[in-house]
Design a protein with these regions (language model features):
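Short, glycine/charge-rich beta-strand/loop segments that flank catalytic centers
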Residues: 137-145, 174-178, 188-203, 221-229
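Alpha-helical recognition segments enriched in aromatics with Gly/Pro capping
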Residues: 72-106, 121, 180, 199-413
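Amphipathic alpha-helical interface segments
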Residues: 34, 178, 437
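N-terminal, positively charged nucleic-acid-binding surface of large information/translation enzymes
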Residues: 91-186, 525
């Protein structure tokens, strides 16, 4: 059952635009977005009434609504991988359509994956700040993510073979965990999370159309391949020109398969000996290639045009290069206006990999007693298109600062006034310069000329994009007489320069959950 606190939040949000994450009967999660009409109904942008069961809600967020006076006069510009320049993200008719490559649900998303998903959230929030409507689609790859075009090894099937668990059950388990992590990171839900397994008709239709247009062919092995040479501008996104690509440019080269050209890729693979996750098609039972799902989904769900396409830098080639070739061939136009890629994330100086044993999950951060939004905070300290080296030290520092900022807002009262700040707005709208925004927040915190209420209002303005829940509130705990006695004894010990006793008392207080700081004004404390 949904906790009373969550039900209360829903009941108190009538008339507001919200996103509610619901658990389906099959264990999967979906998001409904719209204006809340009652505790069980909302109206989406198309005017449709969506009925939901609040007892299946696992996360709930009110989507920020900006007053005109709080909206930036500027517009968001992002670095476009295609043109290698900053481009204004304007959309059409006051709305921006975004497609973000989602997870392949055969394992938990690690913190590097989550950095990319955070990017789409920051973009959406910033566009909303500039007064634009946002439609975000993020796919769920639950079939078709092959290790290569030759063997047809599907990552989910490989996990199924290893664990002896049904492949679709594996997909639903990790899809649920993915949505749980998004909620923990305060990432607003997308308008749609289409599953590859549920878009087979659209993918088959797209492949048929590509064959008609002479951009695809049935290979000698019976599988269907995209003809890379049929798309003259192949390589414009990644810089990998066809004439420069050599056999084995993506995978270990093999002579197997029915391709005409080594750079062609599979759109549909015949099942062969495979017995799971296969579908009927005009070419025989089989399964889709990885790249076709994003073309089919984005064209269908975003009306044939994507204003902004977001993904990790590792997807630029071959996935996005191939997707662009497919989509443009299907629409006859440049389907995506702007391509944005987030850079790699290292952890303590090393690339994360399962074999190296240094993959870090959001749950690992929580297990260390850190606020999950400490990860969001730490990621905000770095520009999205700069490689970042995350560490436990930076996460712990983020946790400490997050607590301090929440305490600052709590001490200032519970006002909801938001105060516009031009420097913060400029930082967000200039290629998502979140490090500059964080520096500005720190400057506001230290500025003694800004009153407590104004600081709170400025922090709330920033938090509409930062998404750190700075007004969440701080748990109030009473100091027991025993703890007060320890605090007083430590003050006495320091006055007597009994440093050994002072340190011992600090440790005892820390064990009780108190964090002690010594400064020019003497001893201060806060709850951990």
């Amino acid at each position: 059952m949904t906790s009373m606190s969550l039900r209360t939040q829903i009941a108190q949000a009538l008339g507001k635009r919200v996103t509610i994450r619901l658990r389906d009967s099959d264990g999967g999660l979906r998001d409904v977005v719209g204006v809340l009409q009652s505790e069980t109904e909302l109206v989406n942008r198309r005017g449709e009434i969506i009925t939901f069961d609040p007892d299946t809600a696992v996360a709930f967020r009110v989507i920020p609504v900006f007053n005109r006076r709080d909206i930036s006069s500027g517009s968001l510009s992002m670095y476009d991988t295609m043109s290698r320049t900053l481009k204004e993200i304007s959309g059409r008719d006051g709305a921006v359509r975004i497609y973000c490559c989602g997870p392949t649900v055969y394992r938990d998303a690690h913190v590097g994956n989550l950095r990319t998903f955070l990017l789409s959230d920051l973009v959406s929030r910033t566009l909303q700040m500039t007064g634009l409507e946002v439609t975000l689609v993020q796919n769920i790859t639950d079939v078709g993510h092959m290790a290569d075009d030759f063997t047809g090894d599907d990552k989910i099937l490989a996990e199924s073979a290893k664990t002896k668990v049904d492949p679709f059950e594996i997909a639903r388990i990790f899809e649920t965990r993915f949505h749980t992590d998004l909620a923990r990171l305060n990432i607003q839900g997308a308008d749609s999370y289409p599953r590859a397994s549920e878009k087979m008709t659209e993918m088959i239709s797209s492949i048929e159309r590509l064959i008609e247009l002479k951009h695809a062919y049935v290979g000698t092995d019976g599988s269907v391949y995209f003809d890379a040479t049929s798309f003259p501008s192949y390589g414009a996104l990644s810089g990998n020109k066809l004439e420069a690509l050599k056999p084995g440019h993506r995978y270990e080269f093999t002579d197997e398969g029915g391709k005409r050209f080594h750079a062609d890729w599979a759109l549909w693979k015949l099942a062969g000996a495979r017995t799971q996750m296969i579908w009927d098609s005009p070419w025989g039972a089989g399964f889709p290639g990885w790249h076709i799902e994003c073309s089919a989904m984005s064209i269908e769900l975003l009306d044939g045009h994507v204003d902004l396409h977001i993904g990790g830098i590792d997807l630029r080639f071959p996935h996005h290069e191939n997707e662009r070739a497919q989509s443009n061939s299907l629409t006859g136009d440049e389907t995506v206006d702007t391509w944005v890629h987030g850079e790699h994330l290292l952890f303590e100086g090393r690339k994360m990999s399962k074999s190296a044993g240094n993959v870090v999950l959001l749950q690992d951060i929580i297990d260390r007693g850190l606020d999950p939004l400490s990860l969001r905070f730490a990621l905000l300290e770095n520009r999205y298109r700069s490689q970042m080296d995350l560490s436990w030290a930076s996460l712990e520092a983020a946790h400490t600062t997050l607590k301090r900022w929440r305490q600052l807002l709590a001490d200032a009262g519970d006002g909801t006034t938001v105060k516009f700040d031009q420097e913060l707005s400029d930082a967000f709208t200039t290629d998502l310069d979140t490090p500059r925004a964080m520096q500005r927040i720190r400057a506001i915190e230290k500025d003694i000329s800004i009153g407590a209420l104004d600081k709170r209002a400025l922090f709330l303005f920033a938090d509409q994009v930062l998404g750190l829940d700075l007004d969440r509130g701080v748990e109030k705990k009473e100091i027991t007489p025993e703890l007060q006695a320890l605090l007083d004894a430590r003050i006495t010990a320091r006055a007597e320069k009994n440093w050994h006793m002072s340190d011992s008392l600090r440790d005892q207080l820390a064990d009780a959950g108190l964090e002690i700081k010594d400064g020019p004004g003497g001893q201060s404390w806060s709850w951990k």
